[in-house]
UniProtKB/Swiss-Prot annotation:
Entry-linked InterPro entries: Restrct_endonuc-II-like, tRNA_endonuc-like_dom_sf, UPF0102_YraN-like
PANTHER family given in the database record: UPF0102 PROTEIN YRAN (PTHR34039:SF1)
This protein's name: UPF0102 protein RHE_CH00320
NCBIfam families named in the record: PRK12497.1-5
Coiled-coil zones: none
One Pfam family of this chain: UPF0102
Family: Belongs to the UPF0102 family.
GO MF annotation terms: nucleic acid binding
């Protein structure tokens, strides 16, 4: 497999990941959440989705996998730490930070099925 083939594979994976994030964001909106950020990047890491419902802010990691267990297992302890660190930076910039509660969720996006939301996953 040449470099060109790897580039095509990476591009497809990025496109699939981006599409999964859009699907997850739409799913959250149907559940009454307001999307505050998609693919929010900080110097400490990236958060796929930042959403809010009332005083609850959720930081969501989206995983496109064939099964729920594979999606949950794909969020490593190191990734959880990066997401928490990035969320601390995001929260520090919010004027109403003191009254916000926060939660860390996972959304599994699987082919041919509705997304599965795992609240308080880590």
């Amino acid at each position: 497999m040449g470099n060109k083939d790897l580039t095509v594979i990476k591009r497809k994976a990025l496109r699939r990941g981006r599409m999964s994030e859009y699907v997850a964001a739409a799913f959250l909106m149907l559940k009454g959440y307001r999307i505050l950020a998609l693919r929010h990047r900080t110097r400490l890491g990236e958060i796929d989705i930042v959403a809010r419902k009332g005083d609850l802010t959720i930081f969501v990691e989206v995983k496109a996998r064939h099964g729920e267990a594979a999606a949950i297992d794909a969020v490593s302890v190191a990734a959880q730490k990066r997401i928490r660190a990035a969320s601390d930076l995001w929260l520090a910039r919010q004027a109403d930070q003191a009254r916000l509660s926060q939660r860390y969720d996972i959304i599994a996006v699987m082919p041919g099925r509705l997304p599965r939301h795992f609240p308080d996953a880590f």
